[in-house]
Amino acid sequence: MTAAENVCYTLINVPMDSEPPSEISLKNDLEKGDVKSKTEALKKVIIMILNGEKLPGLLMTIIRFVLPLQDHTIKKLLLVFWEIVPKTTPDGRLLHEMILVCDAYRKDLQHPNEFIRGSTLRFLCKLKEAELLEPLMPAIRACLEHRHSYVRRNAVLAIYTIYRNFEHLIPDAPELIHDFLVNEKDASCKRNAFMMLIHADQDRALDYLSTCIDQVQTFGDILQLVIVELIYKVCHANPSERARFIRCIYNLLQSSSPAVKYEAAGTLVTLSSAPTAIKAAAQCYIDLIIKESDNNVKLIVLDRLIELKEHPAHERVLQDLVMDILRVLSTPDLEVRKKTLQLALDLVSSRNVEELVIVLKKEVIKTNNVSEHEDTDKYRQLLVRTLHSCSVRFPDMAANVIPVLMEFLSDNNEAAAADVLEFVREAIQRFDNLRMLIVEKMLEVFHAIKSVKIYRGALWILGEYCSTKEDIQSVMTEIRRSLGEIPIVESEIKKEAGELKPEEEITVGPVQKLVTEMGTYATQSALSSSRPTKKEEDRPPLRGFLLDGDFFVAASLATTLTKIALRYVALVQEKKKQNSFVAEAMLLMATILHLGKSSLPKKPITDDDVDRISLCLKVLSECSPLMNDIFNKECRQSLSHMLSAKLEEEKLSQKKESEKRNVTVQPDDPISFMQLTAKNEMNCKEDQFQLSLLAAMGNTQRKEAADPLASKLNKVTQLTGFSDPVYAEAYVHVNQYDIVLDVLVVNQTSDTLQNCTLELATLGDLKLVEKPSPLTLAPHDFANIKANVKVASTENGIIFGNIVYDVSGAASDRNCVVLSDIHIDIMDYIQPATCTDAEFRQMWAEFEWENKVTVNTNMVDLNDYLQHILKSTNMKCLTPEKALSGYCGFMAANLYARSIFGEDALANVSIEKPIHQGPDAAVTGHIRIRAKSQGMALSLGDKINLSQKKTSI
């Protein structure tokens, strides 16, 4: 056992720089010194005994000269001294001197000072000698009637401990404490007494509870918590008692203490699965979330609500509470809001979706009135996505949502506007009846759009879905308005010339000489340098984008103009109008090409954009039926296929999720005939109090996989060889932020090994909590040594060290056995996670650490290799299965995972199979890993390389 596992009541720091005092000097100070000297001497004695010194000669001195003193500090120190001093002879008999000490205990138990009485009673809880306790029993009983509650509650604790360890000393303890409990008024005393009855005589505790079950609401919160625990344990052991106590739990839901309400709600859910019980518990959880200010508490209680939702029967009850759950959105914390919106979205039904949409619309409008903040922007995105999902699931709601969301297309926050655009694109494709409304609203906000990315998307939607002659003309009008005066080059040159004239007449301040790219001189005044800012602000949006050198939007505009021109030709029969419209579209494209070739834009037009615009010009000049089909039919079909694939993917993931949630009973499962209780009823559940205690102690028992190979033996690491004098192997147990090394050490020699010490050191973000204690191993004996290691981040860590020992009777130096390195597997800390494509791209751009891993494998199938990487790295593939299906010789996929420390890990797999090398050619390519920290990126890269080596063998 390690030092941390031994029972220890007192920890005292030992100064290493001072010399230990002699027994004679201590004896002199204890006999003849003043109170201060005796106090210091007593402290030194305590430290020496803790260090292993016996000091038997000082026991009588302390009894004679220190024990009679009434100083409170000395009395406190004496309690520590009597706790640690050896009280028995080597053969186990009580020392005669302890009779005198026992008399001192009795006097302290009758002391007029309540603190001395109470602290003495607490000290008696630690005594393990029945001979010392027996004479004190009358005094301990008398303390139950003391006027002060501090004495009474410690007397209850003392009686409970003595009854548990030495029942014969006080056989009537349960009856005594029951009588005490009936007449007691103090909350802490009642709590201690009731707790003792729960563990010592549960029937008496239940009898007492039955007599006062109607007054439970008036009890203090500490007693109420114990009552909840008792009811849970009783009903867990005996489900037939549920009807007897369920009303009490209902009453405790109205307690003034949040802790009691939380525990009562959790217990009620386990006691009953009736809709009224689930509704009451859920309502209690919601009230707690709203009223508690601590965000951690809110998140914990939200998790309990989410757990309730996982049960199919409970989910139907929670659906009626969606509007109550939405009250949690008043919390400013983003994580709480995110979980709340997801929960509401999972629970929403056709009955309450209208109310949900109304609340979300109000929340969206509220975000407009709040000063711009990063969390406000993110919250707006969450609201947009939630409304998007509602509209897809409930198409009738889309008409109410669209007008509110369309206003956000002109928002400064590009991410929120992009989410709105994605929603609008899906809505206009899915809902034919809303196309007119969407086009109308899009035209209203088109001129106010500030982001070029949103502008491109809006252009595409307008070009694809304006189907009437009036809409087409409106789109052309908006484009002309957004482009400004044409031809652009001539109008810009005229504007420059027009603006320079008045400036020439004004005498301006200092004129600065500048050298142009051509090597000539140019002048620039303070006035002329400040003018462009105002001029740029006055530019129409599309013109501004083009002059800034963003010609990608011009390529998108050319496609839009081509689509609407071809559609206009099909709708209007008059040749003159057809030619006029097509000519106008071609003029706009030509003027943009001219601008791109000129020196006016900040960046010249790219060859790709020139090719695209030229192609559109050619299509309009020829107007062939084939091109008409490609532009007006094939594009829309591509979007339809993409949305169908996305919807199918979502349905598939939901189906998998529901299959996980559904608890199926196998045909060969044993049947519980008693009341034909279902498998998920309480008598088959684990004790929640016991589970939480185990979790707090780090002893959480994880469920092993069905595969027999996935046992603890898989994690045993051999540290030394079988031929070494000391054989060692370790089991690495990972428990969230801790690693426990359980090391088996075997003495393989015929000698006794003394001071056998396991010396460990760490590499990486690991920290050894304590140094394992040395031990002695008999010939061919073995022992287990435990060592705790703290983990701070997801990074490959290495634990290394050696075992040193002395051979009994040998005069040689210490012997040393070097241990093999223990590599900590980061897969224990990485969990698959999901994020949107936009979030993935944003993180990809932000993360500064990249690790590029070259593919080196014998595998010949692209999909098999991807599955191998997913299994090796514990990451989730974000790329839809449909996009990965089929065979084309290459594959690209995005992977994502998150560590338990909140670190994100991204990976992009880009692999191909060289076709010219035949069907047996190995997969080639590379994997790029990005993370915020260097350790995460390197660790994942190492993991992939290691997995590749295994496949290459």
From Swiss-Prot:
State the annotated membrane topology for this chain: Peripheral membrane protein
Q: Name one GO biological process term.
A: endoplasmic reticulum to Golgi vesicle-mediated transport
Q: Which GO terms describe its molecular function?
A: structural molecule activity
The known PTMs are summarized as:
Proteolytically cleaved between Ser-528 and Ser-529 by CAPN8.
Question: Where on the chain is N6-acetyllysine found, per UniProt?
Answer: K494
Q: Which UniProt keywords apply?
A: Acetylation, Cataract, Cell membrane, Cytoplasm, Cytoplasmic vesicle, Disease variant, ER-Golgi transport, Golgi apparatus, Host-virus interaction, Intellectual disability, Membrane, Protein transport, Repeat, Transport
Principal place where this protein is found?
A: cytoplasm
GO terms under cellular component: COPI vesicle coat; cytosol; endoplasmic reticulum membrane; endoplasmic reticulum-Golgi intermediate compartment; ficolin-1-rich granule membrane; Golgi apparatus; Golgi membrane; Golgi-associated vesicle
Kindly state the subunit structure of this protein. Answer: Oligomeric complex that consists of at least the alpha, beta, beta', gamma, delta, epsilon and zeta subunits. Interacts with SCYL1. Interacts with COPG1. Interacts (via trunk domain) with ARF1 (via switch I region); the interaction is direct. Interacts with KCNK2/TREK (via N-terminus); this interaction increases the channel-mediated whole cell currents and promotes plasma membrane expression of KCNK2/TREK. (Microbial infection) Interacts (via C-terminus) with HIV-1 Nef; the interaction is direct.
Functionally, this protein is described as follows: The coatomer is a cytosolic protein complex that binds to dilysine motifs and reversibly associates with Golgi non-clathrin-coated vesicles, which further mediate biosynthetic protein transport from the ER, via the Golgi up to the trans Golgi network. Coatomer complex is required for budding from Golgi membranes, and is essential for the retrograde Golgi-to-ER transport of dilysine-tagged proteins.
Protein name in the entry: Coatomer subunit beta
Q: Which species is listed as the source?
A: Homo sapiens
Gene that this polypeptide is encoded by: COPB1
